[in-house]
């Protein structure tokens, strides 16, 4: 991912008086600062990101200008108005970034909750371990909330967390601050696909381990082949001999996932890794991990249902066995 950090500014929100401490200067983009911001932005392009496209007249989008200082102050104040109602307020850094990705201008807004951390102070003899406040999380940790916007296409990627207010949980970031209705994340969409497939299979008394393995294989194969999941194609793969089940699956899936699950600009590697193997836990304590391509090959693995209702698993053509 070719990301070039141009400018960044950081403001701070204090929970004590719900005030903002506004900076008036940009960050000095040292190599380490550049790496830190770049990694935070890269993590937004994950399977947990909600996506959408801002309408041209969207008020939030129209606050984003070339003047990063003015933009950041305006958006920080708008954010504070919506976030301050939360019942669990913490000190947060609000980071605003101008950057280019693959040569296209982008904007990022990162909310990073600061942590308490134990620090070893080498010069202290009697008490070298101190509890320090307002520490940024490490390089490998994502922002608590993040918005990345392609300023050319108006497409956005959003990582958001709900806040609790009057006993209810609110998607304050998307609903109130951005005033948008994003698509649900690929990760959540896939969970909906799995859940719906099992529900349909249960209604036809076919939800056994073989069907669940079939679901995993279908998701893996479709992701690997086309980098997207189409409800219609999955329905054909899962319920090829049952028209009623196919139509029911498509109708029920589209209530939660109205469009194909696409991984455009989003890293699908975590989902591919999740579904690349079949994991079976047997009643006798044996656990098997079988790669999908082997699992689907009758010359390698065969499942036999015995007359007494039990199963036997025949593993064939093994050239070598190693103990690990």
Residue ranges, per PLM feature:
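C-terminal structured domains
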Residues: 238-324
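Long, hydrophobic alpha/beta structural blocks
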Residues: 1-274
